[in-house]
Swiss-Prot record:
Protein family: Belongs to the universal ribosomal protein uS3 family.
Record has Metal-binding as a keyword: no
InterPro entries membership: KH_dom, KH_dom-like_a/b, KH_dom_type_2, KH_sf_prok-type, Ribosomal_S3_C_sf, Ribosomal_uS3_bac-typ, Ribosomal_uS3_C, Ribosomal_uS3_CS
GO CC terms of this entry: cytosolic small ribosomal subunit
Assembly, per entry: Part of the 30S ribosomal subunit. Forms a tight complex with proteins S10 and S14.
Purpose: Binds the lower part of the 30S subunit head. Binds mRNA in the 70S ribosome, positioning it for translation.
High-level lineage: Bacteria, Bacillati, Bacillota, Bacilli, Lactobacillales
Protein's gene: rpsC
Keywords of the record: Ribonucleoprotein, Ribosomal protein, RNA-binding, rRNA-binding
Protein's UniProt name: Small ribosomal subunit protein uS3
Organism, as annotated: Lactobacillus delbrueckii subsp. bulgaricus (strain ATCC 11842 / DSM 20081 / BCRC 10696 / JCM 1002 / NBRC 13953 / NCIMB 11778 / NCTC 12712 / WDCM 00102 / Lb 14)
PROSITE patterns reported for this sequence: KH_TYPE_2, RIBOSOMAL_S3
Domain of life according to the entry: Bacteria
One MF term in the entry's GO annotations: rRNA binding
């Protein structure tokens, strides 16, 4: 089953955390739809800002949003103008107090979402799919990845019949729960139709910390 299930959902609670952290006793549907509107708005507004992950936390009437991006300057803007504008627009969208935190991604070549976005943009620019996937995989391996797997599916090179092509380097153990596997899928819109890009990146193993050992009890009894 490790090969079929979403590897991020498979590892939730093990070495991955939820991207939305809130609890709603009532109005769950409205809160979830509000989350989806926020994510859709940020996807459209920051499509060129190399955003990998958006985390949303809620407390009372406050919404905390953490934007993980490889281009923090583009999101923040000159003197913080862009992030202030984002804050106001999301505030108007939700009617809640919004706080935005920008988190810089140090190694974008180890983020599956950014790698998949890069491959999709190259496919839309009519670059050969094998070249795009091979170069992306090589950059990820040079950045420190233990393994990477890329799947591209659709009418590749304008072929009449859609097919699926893979490129794999290193090791990507989908069944190993302690393996830090990042996963993303993106659609590329070409003149021949829609092409799907999926990327799995193995960033190594996350070993659980040792739990505190209980103090050893001394044996009772008289000497």
């Amino acid at each position: 089953m490790g090969s079929k299930i979403n590897p991020i959902g498979f590892r939730l609670g093990v070495n991955r955390d939820w991207e939305a952290k809130w609890y709603a006793a009532r109005g769950y549907k409205e809160t979830l739809n509000e989350d989806l509107r926020i994510r859709k708005f940020l996807d459209e507004k920051l499509k060129d800002a190399s955003v990998s992950t958006v985390e949303i936390e809620r407390a009372a009437n406050r919404v905390n949003i953490a934007i993980h991006t490889a281009r923090p300057g583009m999101v923040i803007g000159k003197g913080g103008a862009e992030v202030e504008a984002l804050n106001k627009e999301i505030n108007a969208l939700t009617n809640k107090q919004v706080h935005i935190n920008i988190v810089e991604i140090k190694k974008p070549d180890l983020e599956a979402k950014l790698v998949a976005d890069g491959i999709a943009r190259q496919l839309e620019a009519r670059i050969a799919f094998r070249r795009a996937s091979r170069q992306a995989a090589q950059r990820s391996m040079r950045a420190g990845a233990k393994g990477i797997k890329v799947q591209i599916a659709g009418r590749l090179n304008g072929a009449d019949i859609a097919r699926r092509e893979w490129h794999t380097e290193g090791s990507v153990p989908l069944h190993t729960l302690r393996a830090d596997i990042d996963y993303a899928w993106v659609n590329a819109f070409t003149t021949y139709g829609e092409i799907g890009v999926k990327v799995w990146i193995n960033r190594g193993e996350i070993l659980p910390g040792r739990k505190n050992q209980p103090a050893k009890r001394s044996k009772g009894g008289k000497k």
